Curated annotation (Swiss-Prot):
Purpose: CRISPR (clustered regularly interspaced short palindromic repeat) is an adaptive immune system that provides protection against mobile genetic elements (viruses, transposable elements and conjugative plasmids). CRISPR clusters contain spacers, sequences complementary to antecedent mobile elements, and target invading nucleic acids. CRISPR clusters are transcribed and processed into CRISPR RNA (crRNA).
Gene assigned in the entry: devR
Similarity comment text for this entry: Belongs to the CRISPR-associated protein Cas7/Cst2/DevR family. Subtype I-B/Tneap subfamily.
Top-level taxonomic group: Bacteria
Alphabetized InterPro entries for the sequence: Cas7/Cst2/DevR_bac, Cas7/Cst2/DevR_sub_I-B/Tneap, CRISPR-assoc_Cas7/Cst2/DevR
Gene Ontology BP annotations: defense response to virus; sporulation resulting in formation of a cellular spore
Induction comment from the UniProt entry of this chain: Part of an operon going from at least MXAN_7266 to MXAN_7259 that includes a CRISPR operon with transcription continuing into the pre-crRNA locus.
This protein's name: CRISPR-associated protein Cas7/Cst2/DevR
CDD domains, per the entry: Cas7_I (cd09650)
Disruption phenotype: Essential for sporulation, decreases sporulation 100 to 1000-fold, aggregation is defective.
Organism: Myxococcus xanthus (strain DK1622)
Keywords attached to this entry: Antiviral defense, Fruiting body, Sporulation
C-alpha cells in the first residue's frame, strides 16, 4: 500500500492587511469566508503554492519562475516535453509536485483540442484564520502624488481604509511520495513548507510569516487525512490546542504512532494529553519534527 503524508500547519501570530489588493470603495479588503458560523479571513492555496515555488527554486531548477522586473512568469519547458511517454529528460521539481495544465484549441474545424495535464501530487488547502475577524479597519491618507499613477489633481491627501486582522492562519497539505517522478522530492517539499516565509496574494503589501509555529504530520497508509484544520485557539502556551485531534486519537480513528508533532503546541500539552498521544513523536521544535517526518520517509524508501 502507498504511504500518504498529511500535515497541518499553524503560523505565528501576525497582522494581515491588503491581501490581493482587493477594494470595496476606498477600503482595501481582506478575503473572507464564513467558518463555523463566523466571519474569518483567508489566504488562497495558490498564494501558498506561489511562495513554495520560490523556495523550491532555491533548491533545484523550477520550470516556472517569476520575474519581478517584468512581473511575469517565465517557462523553461512550456510544452512540458519532459512528461511525454518516451522522454528521458529530467523533470522539474515544481511540475512534479505542483502539477500543470496546458490546453490548446483545435487548429482545424471538427478537430479536437489537446491538453497536457498533471494533477498536483502536493495538494494544498486554503489557509483560514484561527480566530474570527472582528472588523478592524485602520484609517490612512495617501499623500498627493504618492505613486506615479496616483491622482494628480489637487493638493489634499487621499483618504482610504484598510481592513486588518491580527491572527494566526492554519492550512494543510497532502502528499503521496510514490506518485512523484522523483519520490525524494517529498522530503524537499516538507523541508521548504517548514521554512516557508512570507506569503501574500497579488499586490500583497503586508509581511506575514507563514513559517509554521506548530505542526502535525501524519504518515499513514490510509487515504483520509483526518488532521486538516486540527488547530483550535487556546489561552495555553502557543495559543493553540488540538482537542478534536486528541478525540480522534482516543477513539482509535487516528493511531498515535502515525503522528509527529512539533512546535509550541507540544509545550502546551498537559499530562493527560501526552498520555493520549503515547506512541506519537513529540518535539518542541518545528524543524525537529520536520526532520523526524522526513526520516520516516527515508526509512520507508529503503
Amino acid at each position: 500500500m502507498s504511504l500518504h503524508v498529511f500535515a497541518a500547519f499553524v503560523t505565528p501570530l501576525g497582522t494581515a492587511a491588503n491581501n490581493r489588493g482587493l477594494t470595496e470603495g476606498n477600503i482595501t479588503s481582506l478575503q473572507k469566508l464564513v467558518w463555523n458560523g463566523q466571519v474569518h479571513t483567508t489566504v488562497s492555496a495558490e498564494s501558498i503554492r506561489f511562495a513554495l515555488r520560490r523556495r523550491l527554486n532555491e533548491q533545484e531548477p523550477c520550470n516556472r519562475t517569476y520575474d519581478d522586473a517584468s512581473r511575469a512568469n517565465a517557462w523553461k519547458d512550456a510544452a512540458f516535453s519532459a512528461w511525454s511517454g518516451k522522454s528521458k529528460e529530467k523533470t522539474y521539481i515544481d511540475d512534479d509536485l505542483l502539477g500543470f495544465m496546458s490546453a490548446e484549441g483545435a487548429k482545424q474545424e471538427k478537430e479536437k483540442g489537446t491538453a497536457k495535464v498533471r494533477r498536483a501530487v502536493l495538494e494544498v488547502s486554503r489557509a483560514v484564520s484561527l480566530t474570527p475577524w472582528s472588523g478592524d479597519v485602520t484609517f490612512n491618507a495617501a499623500s498627493p502624488g504618492a505613486t506615479p499613477s496616483a491622482q494628480k489633481k489637487g493638493s489634499n491627501p487621499v483618504p482610504y481604509g484598510t481592513e486588518m486582522h491580527a491572527t494566526r492562519y492554519q492550512y494543510g497539505v497532502a502528499l503521496t511520495p510514490e506518485a512523484l517522478r522523483v519520490p525524494a522530492r517529498a522530503v524537499t517539499a516538507l523541508n521548504q513548507l517548514c521554512a516557508l516565509g512570507p506569503v501574500a496574494g497579488n499586490h500583497g503589501r503586508f509581511l506575514f510569516d507563514f513559517s509554521p509555529e506548530s505542526v502535525v504530520f501524519r504518515l499513514t497508509q490510509e487515504a483520509a487525512p483526518r488532521i486538516l484544520y486540527a488547530f483550535e485557539p487556546s489561552s495555553r502556551a502557543g495559543g493553540v490546542e488540538l482537542a478534536a485531534l486528541l478525540r480522534k486519537v482516543k477513539s482509535g480513528d487516528v493511531p498515535a504512532k502515525e503522528l509527529v508533532l512539533g512546535g509550541q503546541v507540544v509545550e502546551g500539552l498537559g499530562a493527560e494529553e501526552r498520555e493520549v498521544l503515547s506512541g506519537a513523536e513529540l518535539h518542541t521544535g518545528v524543524v525537529a519534527a520536520c526532520r523526524a517526518a522526513c526520516k520516516r520517509l527515508e526509512v520507508r524508501k529503503k
